[in-house]
Amino acid sequence: MDIERVEQVRAVERLAHRRGLALMPRAGLAAADFVAARLPAGAQVLALAGPGNNGGDALVAATLLQARGYRVAVVMPAGPARLPDDARRAWQDWCAAGGQASADLPAHAPALVIDGLFGIGLARPLGGAWQGLIDQVNAWRVPVLALDVPSGLSAASGQPLGDPPGRPVRATWTLSFIGVPAALRAPGAAAWCGQQHLSLLGLTPAFLAEAVGPCGQATATAARRSGP
């Protein structure tokens, strides 16, 4: 079945958590495989890791790509102090692999950027510092892989966040996990999302259907009634 609303994605995530399924390693692997299919080993990759689980996905991808021979740099403007648990584990794995992070963008553009700053949960306008960083990334005009949604774009409306609207990451590709919110398929979103791709993270249609309920409505009860 198609997952087309943010609340449906959240319902799937809740059920996965209830079942003990770790989705972040799967998302990071999907992102790393996506990059590896389009960029030769040894190339420079910059992973932008934000303060939430989207940043954790980017950190997993960074760790895997470094292990495959890519030259990977990580930029974490907000630092690791307030990362949620799963993302913190991804940060610890990155550090254990010898990785470091900077708060600032490098002086020179990489071959490819992974945008893991903000995901589908972002509902507020970007602040000035975040907007400045995104503007610099866009000015590089290098390929950008956005995870879930280009940072600064509303997954609910498909429009840039803010009034006046901000300037989201301009992605070459957007790799959505579990489902693609319908708003991201709207014509106005295409300029920011680039080519749309979807990874189901190995979840079966039956699992997705159970998570969102018999009528396709995302409900917490689907997660609550399922044992581990």
Curated annotation (Swiss-Prot):
Keyword annotations: Isomerase, Metal-binding, NAD, NADP, Nucleotide-binding, Potassium
Cofactor(s) it depends on: K(+)
SUPFAM superfamilies: YjeF N-terminal domain-like
UniProt-listed Enzyme Commission number(s): 5.1.99.6
Catalysed reaction equations from the record: (6R)-NADHX = (6S)-NADHX; (6R)-NADPHX = (6S)-NADPHX
Family per similarity comment: Belongs to the NnrE/AIBP family.
Purpose: Catalyzes the epimerization of the S- and R-forms of NAD(P)HX, a damaged form of NAD(P)H that is a result of enzymatic or heat-dependent hydration. This is a prerequisite for the S-specific NAD(P)H-hydrate dehydratase to allow the repair of both epimers of NAD(P)HX.
Binding sites annotated in the UniProt record for K(+): 54, 115, 151
Lineage of the organism: Bacteria, Pseudomonadati, Pseudomonadota, Betaproteobacteria, Burkholderiales
Enzyme class: isomerase
Cofactor binding note from Swiss-Prot or TrEMBL: Binds 1 potassium ion per subunit.
Matches recorded under HAMAP family: NADHX_epimerase
Gene3D superfamilies tied to this protein: YjeF N-terminal domain (3.40.50.10260)
Domain YjeF N-terminal: 9-209
Protein name per Swiss-Prot or TrEMBL: NAD(P)H-hydrate epimerase
Cited PROSITE patterns: YJEF_N
InterPro entries in alphabetical order: YjeF_N_dom, YjeF_N_dom_sf
GO molecular function annotation: metal ion binding; NAD(P)HX epimerase activity; nucleotide binding
Record's keyword annotation contains Nuclease: no
Residues that, per the record, bind (6S)-NADPHX: 53-57, 119-125, 148
